[in-house]
Every structure is written in C-alpha cells, then in structure tokens.
Amino acid sequence: KFSSDVHYELELVFRIGKVGKNIEAKFAHKYIDSYGLGIDFTARDVQSKLKEKGLPWEKAKAFNGSAFVSTMLPFEASLLDNPIHFSLHKNETLVQDGNSGLMIWNVAELIEDVSKYFTLKTGDYIFTGTPAGVGPIAIGDVLKGSLEGQKLFELTIS
C-alpha cells in the first residue's frame, strides 16, 4: 500500500490556451482559455517522512491519480474582476469554502511567476491553492465540487 493517509485539497484551476513565456501579470488573462476546479491529493504520511529527511515532496504530491480536474468553463477576462467562489462537499458535508480573493497571489501573478521558469503550453493546467478545510479521504467517500454555485463534479473515491 502506497499511503494510508491521503488528503484532498480543492483548488481553482486555469487552463492555458496559448504558448507563453515571461508573461506580465497585466497580460495573463490573454493566456487563459478556461477555468474550473481541481483536487490535489496528497499522501500526508509519505510527505511527513520526506519532510523529516529534508527531501523533496514530489512522491507525496505527484503519484498516479494525485490530481483531478473538473469540467472546464469558458474563461472571460472580466472573471478576474471579482472573487470567484468555490466549495467542496465530502459525503454531503461542506468541508471547503473559499474564493479567489482569499488567495495570497492572484491568478495573473501566478502566471507571471510560473512563466518566468516554465514555458506555458496550450493545455497546461495551473492549480492555484486551497482554502481551509483540507482533510483525509477514504474509499467510498463522495466529493462534490461547485464553482459559483454550479456543481462541476461528483466523484467517488475507489
């Protein structure tokens, strides 16, 4: 068994629509073609062992099935003018509820920073960060994600 303590982290996700490098924040909206939700699954027990040894966390964050992306919605630049609300229910209980206005870096700043180090390519996804409420999952749990009140996904952990 790879991990006995996997946690969910709901995040806003933006899909890149054209190739870009060294993108200024003021132009970032021109590189986004859609947005939606994603779940970043983390093996906390694996992460703790790696942290103790001062090692990188990629084994805890980048394993098979460690990311899920919802249906994506068309993006318009005006969406960045106001906070984007998103939430996650686990087994019908609200566990995460947040909005883009609570993020330390907004999506334009994220794109500017990431594009300094990596060429962004058409189809790349940028996960933005997670609101409070991260927690463990178990086989059979049902996760439902909503964006601006619209349900974008429902998945059962297997």
Regions found by a protein language model. Name each.
Residues 1-121, 125, 133-158:
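Catalytic-core "active-site belt" of small-molecule-metabolizing enzymes
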